[in-house]
Amino acid sequence: MGLTSLQVCMDSDWLQESESSGGSMLDSSTNSPSAADILAACSTRPQASAVAVAAAALMDGGRRLRPPHDHPQKCPRCESTHTKFCYYNNYSLSQPRYFCKTCRRYWTKGGTLRNIPVGGGCRKNKKPSSSNSSSSTSSGKKPSNIVTANTSDLMALAHSHQNYQHSPLGFSHFGGMMGSYSTPEHGNVGFLESKYGGLLSQSPRPIDFLDSKFDLMGVNNDNLVMVNHGSNGDHHHHHNHHMGLNHGVGLNNNNNNGGFNGISTGGNGNGGGLMDISTCQRLMLSNYDHHHYNHQEDHQRVATIMDVKPNPKLLSLDWQQDQCYSNGGGSGGAGKSDGGGYGNGGYINGLGSSWNGLMNGYGTSTKTNSLV
């Protein structure tokens, strides 16, 4: 038992003795000893049994079958029909990778295709940016053009307003009705600037028509309007008479001379009436001359009034020129204007014998207005 297993195996004497003693065993088995025989021989010696098992494993190593090889994996990039234009997300660090000899790339299982064209996204992003920049530049230029246009329009408007104040309007139907007029006293005054104040006062000033209403017609001295203001006295002693609409009441109280000898509503007046409102609508005072009283000659006031007839095609109004009616209570109720207001000695139509006809503006006239 003191011998080792290696010494036992290499001892030639032990092998010879075993052959001589077991000659019949060797003769019967011409083949090499099997593993079972070796194990049986070494069973008596436990140390030699381990060596015998290792030797048997070396001898039988060529006969053992190898594990079957894995089936070749198909590269998903090569099998895909979209690989020419699309990327393939086929690489994952958590999965074992495979090398494809065809595309010469490593790939792993679990990859998916991404439907993104190669280089397509960059091209699409550049075009909208250029269009946006162009639109922003164009939009930045537009406000400047608008500002210049607005300033030019304002300058043109101011220039036209200056010319309009000192030049008559070019309306052929109205003639000089809306244009500027010039008198020695008033100078050149625009119609829109002075409105009726420039026509009726010595010192014209801008008057708002809506604010002043009826008070703007004849509130200054030496103003001759359609209605004679009530004043106790005659023209022989009074040099300045306030003529105008007396708050809508055209009363003639003891006044011997009026602007127009139209309708007289009472009192001892020798004239001084009211014009028809419809006539006022058709009549505009264009040129107006003021004449003072002359104590040495005739002591009468002369008013020059220009009659302007609108175009019948434009307004379709009936013009009454040679008719006159008088209802004046007194001795001088003639319908003729003192001093010949018209150039041809015409008459002013003073219609309406009652206050209703006066306020309505049409009175008892047989002709009606076509616009109403």
Curated annotation (Swiss-Prot):
The keyword Mitochondrion does not apply. The keyword Ubl conjugation does not apply. Residues 117-146 are annotated as: Disordered. A zinc finger (Dof-type) spans 73-127. The PEAR proteins (e.g. DOF2.4, DOF5.1, DOF3.2, DOF1.1, DOF5.6 and DOF5.3) form a short-range concentration gradient that peaks at protophloem sieve elements (PSE). Preferentially expressed in the vasculature of all organs, including seedlings, roots, stems, buds, leaves, flowers and siliques, and particularly in the cambium, phloem and interfascicular parenchyma cells of inflorescence stems. GO terms for molecular function: DNA-binding transcription factor activity; transcription cis-regulatory region binding; zinc ion binding. This is Dof zinc finger protein DOF5.6. It comes from Arabidopsis thaliana (Mouse-ear cress). The lineage of its organism: Eukaryota, Viridiplantae, Streptophyta, Embryophyta, Tracheophyta.
